[in-house]
Amino acid sequence: MNIDIEDFEKKPLYIQRIILRNSCIEFSKMLKKYWDKNIMIGIQISEREMSFEIEERDNKNEPIKITLPEYRSKGFKWYLAYLITLEYLRILKNGGNNDIVLLLDDPAVYLHPNVQKSFLEKLEELSKEYQILYNTHLMSLFNEEELDRVLLVYLDKENRTKIKRPWSNEQKDIIYPIRRALGVDKILFKENLSKILFVEGISDKFILEGLGKLETLKNLKNWYIHPLSGGDKLEDNEIVKKVRLYSCLSNFEEIKYYFLLDGDKKEKFERDKISNKIIFLGDENQEIEDLIDKNFYLDCVLETYKRIFTHDLEKFKKVKEIVEKLRKSKSKIIEELNNEFRLNNLGDFSKVDVAITIKRKLYENPELANKFEKIIDCLNGKII
């Protein structure tokens, strides 16, 4: 309920009490969505002062006790302040302001770990309405399946703030830098993990996580997708080493796993003893990007580099020329883009950034299955 303060102050006291009580009822309903206990917020108002009270109720909605906010836990007080902020954002949005960014500094630190996980889920829902940025030291507020959203912030040896992405080819464990930053030194596997899909690189991981939003690939969400590499490129011999290393999982009957490799790796593993655990994408001359509808992929390249070259229109103009040139090409798409970017002095082509764009487009529009039919065909019968 939006209250005009000037109008409110002109009303008699009994009308003010009714207005505030109705506001408390609405706010208590919102609180119930986020807090695991039945709580009612009340306001007592007199001619001289106004006070808040918090009423706990049982499962039958009968009152248990009434307390003042200052006597509640730190976690509850933090959550109450957070919800008041959300209500303020809602009022701003209803007033026509759609350019809203919610910044949270180390949120939910006073909450129980189970409530922290619930908070993260609610934050995910909220992100559909607002852009949200938050920093955290809590492992429970980090989702390994949304690695594309994470940036690591740290101090270098000269005490300067640095920001970087949490992946690179040199890192043996992609998640390790984040776990270390959060103070957790566990190995990469999640608790109670039963299905693992190993993919070649982080860009493959992002694309497949996006595909998990498609109705035809909904079973993909049951698989934990772990990249063998952190960056754009992993040497073939390193792929072989890592496949050998992780094939030891066959000793654990409760863990089901597959390696999802580009078709250009077929020759190296065709007669291998673990070949039944490898799914190849396409033929010997293809990578995962070659199995995506070409025009759709190139449109995603344009969208990505329009964002990257926002302040350099000349470079973006070159990207547009490259994209139009490649629409008719029949060569491997990534190979062509790498060559063209080098020839035009645009730096290294980042298929990781394009993969992030693809993932987000799939999140926004799950009706894009026809753009990935070749990948779906490769996964049919094993993953889906």
Curated annotation (Swiss-Prot):
Record keywords: Plasmid
Database matches in InterPro entries: Bact_Antivir_Def_Nuclease, P-loop_NTPase
SUPFAM superfamilies: P-loop containing nucleoside triphosphate hydrolases
Name of the featured protein: Uncharacterized protein MJECL43
Species annotation: Methanocaldococcus jannaschii (strain ATCC 43067 / DSM 2661 / JAL-1 / JCM 10045 / NBRC 100440)
